[in-house]
Amino acid sequence: MKILVIGPSWVGDMMMSQSLYRTLQARYPQAIIDVMAPAWCRPLLSRMPEVNEAIPMPLGHGALEIGERRKLGHSLREKRYDRAYVLPNSFKSALVPFFAGIPHRTGWRGEMRYGLLNDVRVLDKEAWPLMVERYIALAYDKGIMRTAQDLPQPLLWPQLQVSEGEKSYTCNQFSLSSERPMIGFCPGAEFGPAKRWPHYHYAELAKQLIDEGYQVVLFGSAKDHEAGNEILAALNTEQQAWCRNLAGETQLDQAVILIAACKAIVTNDSGLMHVAAALNRPLVALYGPSSPDFTPPLSHKARVIRLITGYHKVRKGDAAEGYHQSLIDITPQRVLEELNALLLQEEA
C-alpha cells in the first residue's frame, strides 16, 4: 500500500504527526509512507524511520493557488498512491490529494471539505481532547474508534533517532565543552512574549545551574536570538563563559542533535519542546495562557508547570514586556526543584 500524508506546517504539529505514521506502519507493515510538508520539515522527517520520502510542499502556508496545487497533484499521479491522510484542517490542504486522484482521502472535516475528502470525519472535541489522538484516530476505519478511550494503548508517541557520533561531532562543531554536562533552554515561543517564561527568570535559573557545575545552551530560531542575549547579559563574566546563545545559529537538524546531547531541557510551550520530548530528554515545560490539555509534551520524562487552568486566547501578555502574569509567577526556584527531581530520576 502506498500512502501520502499531507503534513502540518508547524514544528510541534509535525512532531506529533509522527504518532500517525508509527500507527500506520504498525497496522500496515508493508505500507510505504510519504509525507508532503514544507521543505524545512525535512530534517525532522529524515529522523522518522516510518517515513519513506519527504516531498517538499512548494506553496506558502497561506497561499490558495489552485492552479499550482492542481499541477502539483497531477505530478503525483504517477506515484499511484492508494490512500491520503490530510492533517491540516484547511480547504487548500485537501486539494493536492484530490487532484492526484488518490482513491481514498481521509481527514477531519475542517473547512467543510466534503468532496475533496471522501472519508470525512466529524470532530467531537470532547471525545478527542488531544491533538495527537486526533491524528492517530485517522489511521483507523471510520466509526471504529468513537472516542480516544477506544484507541489501543500505549499510544505510539513520537521518537526521533540521533546517534552518539552525531552528538559528539556537532558539539565539537559548536565548540561546546565536554567538561560540563549541558542543560538546554528553549526560551522562544510563537506569537511573542505571551507564551514565554520571562528572560530574567531564565537568567536566574542559568546562574544557579552554572554555579552547580552545568553549562547552559540556548536554542531557538533567529527570532529568539535577542531573548537569548537578554539572558546572557544578566550573567556575570564568569557565568557567561558557560552559557551559549545558539538561537538562530544552528540549522534545525543541528538543534535536534544538540538537544539530544543535553542532560535535560527547560522550555516554553514551543515546537522545540515537542522535539525534546521525542528525543526522550528529561524536560520541564512551562505553560501560561496556552493549555497542556491539548498539546502536552508526549514523554514520561516531562514535567509541566502551569499555575492557571483553561485555555486563554492571549496573543499579548498582561504585564511589563508583554509577559503573561501566570508565567511571571512561576519562580526559578520551582523550576530548579522540578529539574533536579528529573535529573535524580534519570541517574537512578
Swiss-Prot record:
<dbReference type="GO" id="GO:0009244">
    <property type="term" value="P:lipopolysaccharide core region biosynthetic process"/>
</dbReference>
<protein>
    <recommendedName>
        <fullName>Lipopolysaccharide heptosyltransferase 2</fullName>
        <ecNumber>2.4.99.24</ecNumber>
    </recommendedName>
</protein>
<keyword id="KW-0328">Glycosyltransferase</keyword>
<dbReference type="InterPro" id="IPR051199">
    <property type="entry name" value="LPS_LOS_Heptosyltrfase"/>
</dbReference>
<dbReference type="GO" id="GO:0008713">
    <property type="term" value="F:ADP-heptose-lipopolysaccharide heptosyltransferase activity"/>
</dbReference>
<dbReference type="InterPro" id="IPR011910">
    <property type="entry name" value="RfaF"/>
</dbReference>
<dbReference type="Pfam" id="PF01075">
    <property type="entry name" value="Glyco_transf_9"/>
</dbReference>
<comment type="pathway">
    <text>Bacterial outer membrane biogenesis; LPS core biosynthesis.</text>
</comment>
<dbReference type="GO" id="GO:0005829">
    <property type="term" value="C:cytosol"/>
</dbReference>
<keyword id="KW-0448">Lipopolysaccharide biosynthesis</keyword>
<keyword id="KW-0808">Transferase</keyword>
<comment type="function">
    <text>Glycosyltransferase involved in the biosynthesis of the core oligosaccharide region of lipopolysaccharide (LPS). Catalyzes the addition of the second heptose unit to the heptosyl-Kdo2-lipid A module. The analog ADP-mannose can serve as an alternative donor in place of ADP-L-glycero-D-manno-heptose, but with lower efficiency.</text>
</comment>
<dbReference type="InterPro" id="IPR002201">
    <property type="entry name" value="Glyco_trans_9"/>
</dbReference>
<comment type="similarity">
    <text>Belongs to the glycosyltransferase 9 family.</text>
</comment>
